[in-house]
């Protein structure tokens, strides 16, 4: 009988986006700019909503939490990318890798639930305006936000529980810029036949549930808008939804390709590009989408600028 000696892996090497030192410098500058805009934009949204009484409504409460989640989502990955750009290689311990993935999944899942909550909020505001204060009371808003964070933690716990029971005794190079579940799973020497389908089941279930809420909400919204006789009323109703629909399309479209579609449909390079888009670019775009396409936010921003620079 042959005895195979396995060395337990205690750390992973993340290969990042490129091996070219020149490209790493360029990418560092690009992502530094993106991360700066992400922080400034989302912190500005949070500060603006907190400081402007006219934005103290459920819709903007949810938007402020979305901005906070985008900050956490981007921060869970981008600073680690900077280390990889500035060094020859990025090394993370197994525990640090699992922790990074845990945080990333938490914020990513919370964003899914918040987008669904925001769709429900628009449904109540447009379809049942007289009952809005009752259906979206401070207590209900608190419960909806709290449930979003709890859902994120539960989903993250399921993923990290699977990772924590895996053994790693072979190659330790992850062909990615962060510790994503499929990339880490490839390096395990444990039986992953069951664990390997968990990302699609878990992410797919959350996507189906939240997309169902969003789709039903907007179906009723569309019916209500089409029944409106006033053109101005239609335009106002549409204007409150376009920003949210844009954010939903960008986010759900990307994560569906990554975590639900069969991996044979796209290459590792394409996976990295899509991952960059939803983990780094979208958190930067959300505050721009909501500020540039929202009259209330633009007006509050104008007043805030006047107060600062009279």
Curated annotation (Swiss-Prot):
The UniProt GO MF terms for this protein read:
G protein-coupled receptor activity; olfactory receptor activity
Q: GO CC terms on record?
A: membrane; plasma membrane
Which keywords are on file for this protein?
Cell membrane, Disulfide bond, G-protein coupled receptor, Glycoprotein, Membrane, Olfaction, Receptor, Sensory transduction, Transducer, Transmembrane, Transmembrane helix
GO biological process assignments = G protein-coupled receptor signaling pathway; sensory perception of smell
Q: List the disulfide bonds.
A: 97-189
- Superkingdom assignment: Eukaryota
Subcellular compartments: Cell membrane
Similarity comment text for this entry: Belongs to the G-protein coupled receptor 1 family.
Return the PANTHER family for the record: OLFACTORY RECEPTOR
Q: What is this protein called?
A: Olfactory receptor 5P55
Provide the taxonomic classification.
Answer: Eukaryota, Metazoa, Chordata, Craniata, Vertebrata
Gene name in the database record: Or5p55
């Amino acid at each position: 009988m042959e005895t195979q000696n396995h060395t337990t892996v205690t750390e992973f090497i993340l290969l990042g986006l490129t091996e070219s030192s020149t490209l790493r410098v360029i990418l560092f500058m690009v992502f530094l700019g993106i991360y700066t805009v992400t922080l400034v934009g989302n912190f500005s949204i949070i500060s603006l909503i907190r400081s402007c009484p006219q934005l103290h409504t459920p819709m903007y409460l949810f938007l402020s939490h979305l901005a906070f989640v985008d900050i956490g989502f981007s921060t869970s990955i981008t600073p680690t990318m900077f280390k990889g750009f500035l060094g020859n290689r990025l090394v993370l311990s197994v525990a640090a890798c699992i922790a990074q993935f845990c945080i990333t999944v938490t914020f990513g899942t919370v964003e899914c639930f918040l987008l669904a909550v925001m769709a429900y909020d628009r449904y109540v505001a447009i379809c049942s305006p007289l009952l809005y204060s009752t259906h979206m009371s401070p207590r209900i808003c608190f419960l909806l936000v709290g449930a979003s964070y709890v859902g994120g933690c539960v989903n993250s716990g399921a993923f990290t529980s699977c990772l924590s029971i895996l053994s790693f005794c072979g190659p330790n190079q992850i062909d990615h810029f962060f510790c994503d579940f499929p990339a880490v799973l490839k390096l395990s020497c444990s039986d992953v036949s069951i664990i390997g389908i968990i990302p699609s089941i878990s992410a797919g279930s959350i996507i189906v549930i939240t997309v169902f809420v969003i789709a039903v909400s907007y179906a009723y919204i569309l019916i209500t808008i089409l029944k409106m006789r006033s053109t101005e009323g239609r335009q106002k109703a549409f204007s409150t939804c376009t920003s949210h629909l844009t954010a939903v399309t960008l986010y759900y479209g990307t994560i569906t390709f990554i975590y639900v579609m069969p991996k044979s449909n796209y290459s590792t390079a394409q996976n990295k590009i899509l991952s960059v888009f939803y983990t780094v670019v979208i958190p930067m775009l959300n505050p721009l989408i909501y500020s540039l396409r929202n009259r209330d936010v633009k007006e509050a921003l104008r007043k805030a600028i006047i107060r600062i620079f009279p």
